[in-house]
Amino acid sequence: MDLFIESKINSLLQFLFGSRQDFLRNFKTWSNNNNNLSIYLLIFGIVVFFYKKPDHLNYIVESVSEMTTNFRNNNSLSRWLPRSKFTHLDEEILKRGGFIAGLVNDGNTCFMNSVLQSLASSRELMEFLDNNVIRTYEEIEQNEHNEEGNGQESAQDEATHKKNTRKGGKVYGKHKKKLNRKSSSKEDEEKSQEPDITFSVALRDLLSALNAKYYRDKPYFKTNSLLKAMSKSPRKNILLGYDQEDAQEFFQNILAELESNVKSLNTEKLDTTPVAKSELPDDALVGQLNLGEVGTVYIPTEQIDPNSILHDKSIQNFTPFKLMTPLDGITAERIGCLQCGENGGIRYSVFSGLSLNLPNENIGSTLKLSQLLSDWSKPEIIEGVECNRCALTAAHSHLFGQLKEFEKKPEGSIPEKLINAVKDRVHQIEEVLAKPVIDDEDYKKLHTANMVRKCSKSKQILISRPPPLLSIHINRSVFDPRTYMIRKNNSKVLFKSRLNLAPWCCDINEINLDARLPMSKKEKAAQQDSSEDENIGGEYYTKLHERFEQEFEDSEEEKEYDDAEGNYASHYNHTKDISNYDPLNGEVDGVTSDDEDEYIEETDALGNTIKKRIIEHSDVENENVKDNEELQEIDNVSLDEPKINVEDQLETSSDEEDVIPAPPINYARSFSTVPATPLTYSLRSVIVHYGTHNYGHYIAFRKYRGCWWRISDETVYVVDEAEVLSTPGVFMLFYEYDFDEETGKMKDDLEAIQSNNEEDDEKEQEQKGVQEPKESQEQGEGEEQEEGQEQMKFERTEDHRDISGKDVN
């Protein structure tokens, strides 16, 4: 960074003063003009000041960035201002707390902001940071505070040791370097052993600030404190801002930092020694029990190592697996022979999210999330693989057949020593074949080189224990064979507000160890695709997302792809198009009569009538023209319009005849038709990428306080769920465990029921409050009428009296 600043200063001095010789040569001339000299000296002083004080320059750059950010937020021409119908928050939203906060785009930081906003919607993550990280750290600090006496004694011993290693109060030469290395390594070791939750605290504080209730205010915060707490933060350029990175990469960095903090709280390494079932803790997490909790999960050891039951079949052991964060789960992978069914044991491993690849064929087509999950978990066939059991079985059959042949021959013709050796080998193979799994060591000892059997194996992976917060990454990078470049696959992925993971999950007691059978013993759950098949949002949201996509089109990349595609299409059309084909070589160009048309039919050199060919071509041409006109009309509406702000387009398009009215936002808490099960997860947030592979913008949709928010850096506003589910360019999805074990319902549904009941109570109170003033008003009006009648009677009696008060009559 210092070299970069120095180069900029030298360039500036070169521009202002020329070379140093020119500056000295013209110094006397400049001194005659005091004004110019003062200006140059002032500029030179400012440059030197910023060179000596780079922090002040950073502060000014950040201040200017903040000023431009404020202008961008407050300016009506902002690119991502909310639409006019969203500027007014419903009273129901205000009752729930109003606006949530945004995040400042500090130069290409939309990928960070979208990930942080998505994580802020997770209840499981917030509870984990409060209870499992910060509270544990406070307990450790309290225990260390109670043991301060021992710490002071150890510090005195260390000081005495340092004093004894010095010579005359100083250390020289190689001995000094050796001590420095020892002290630095010791300090690093102590730092690594000390609990450090700096990042976790910064993350919790930032997420809490985002989730606070701001009502009608629209605040936004910076991510500087969080990035400073990261050991590997994204690279930043002082002028250009942060390097554009992938949201998935930043998400992985967040997980790495969080895991590092959790490990610092417990420096003891996880003991993977199997534990007997009788010695398991009372609250042990076995299989899929208590999916919302994070901790040590126990898996049956006999599934991992089937030969473990040979020691003692009466004792069932469990192997521990440590889940560090709420985003950690466990997958089960089975690789087995399709001929004998043997597998080397189920491979359980901890994962922190799923990455689903889009198919390379039919780029741009519409896909389903359930389809991508099924492709991820479908069995993979591996051909030409050695199988230990099949090879030893073949060797056993061969040797056993030899023994049968030996028995048929006369006694003494075969050496007894050879017969005994074959019998011993057969017996050894039979003992090994009796094991559940044949180890590689036994296979190497007993197999015969010419008895190797190649077979086919199946490889399949399922989710054994889903994490409390499941992250799904849609990998949209695809290799384009036409341009030999990596480009973005813009296929639309349909997803639901709730996801039943049952078809892709398998508990520990539901796994088939025989590879010839389906991996899961349970019947394949019916995938509920009803909501995915619907065109959610309709035409309005389709055009809306097209406008957002057009905002971040990379013209150069699209042009290269279009040129390559156009060349391919033109070559294809050139070889297939017969519209200019003339079998008569222009001999009948001037013929137009009906008789001459018949002549064309009769003289076709290819055996086809010219008239028929012309009619078919004209029909096709007319159909193409008609289709092109229809496409042109669609393009005129959706694609050929100038790229202007979406909000301005929606406002100005109100005068057009074919304007599509925006659907109203449903602020009420909705209920899903997906059944409530422990494996039913609720959608919490969605990260969307607009643009191409090399250029674009990340935004986030996240559900909080019962409604969906669209967040583009500093800009935050409410949207309908239909807009979220109709998003075509989904990049990441976050589904959260939402099942309430006590009631057997989803927590979102319970909150919706409670909210609806509160609204009904408020309406009843309002109605009662309206009726009571009406009754009191009617009662008051009756009293006023009675007083008026009495007053009239009094006035009438007064009219019949004279001044003296006597009755005139």
Swiss-Prot record:
Q: Where is the composition biased (Basic and acidic residues)?
A: 184-194, 765-777, 790-809
Per the record, what is one GO cellular component?
A: endoplasmic reticulum
Q: Where is the USP domain?
A: 101-738
Q: Name one GO biological process term.
A: protein deubiquitination
Q: Which Pfam families match?
A: UCH (PF00443)
Keywords of the record: Hydrolase, Phosphoprotein, Protease, Thiol protease, Ubl conjugation pathway
Would you identify the family this protein belongs to, as annotated? Belongs to the peptidase C19 family.
Name of the protein described by the UniProt record: Ubiquitin carboxyl-terminal hydrolase 1
* Organism, as annotated: Saccharomyces cerevisiae (strain ATCC 204508 / S288c)
Lineage in the entry?
Eukaryota, Fungi, Dikarya, Ascomycota, Saccharomycotina
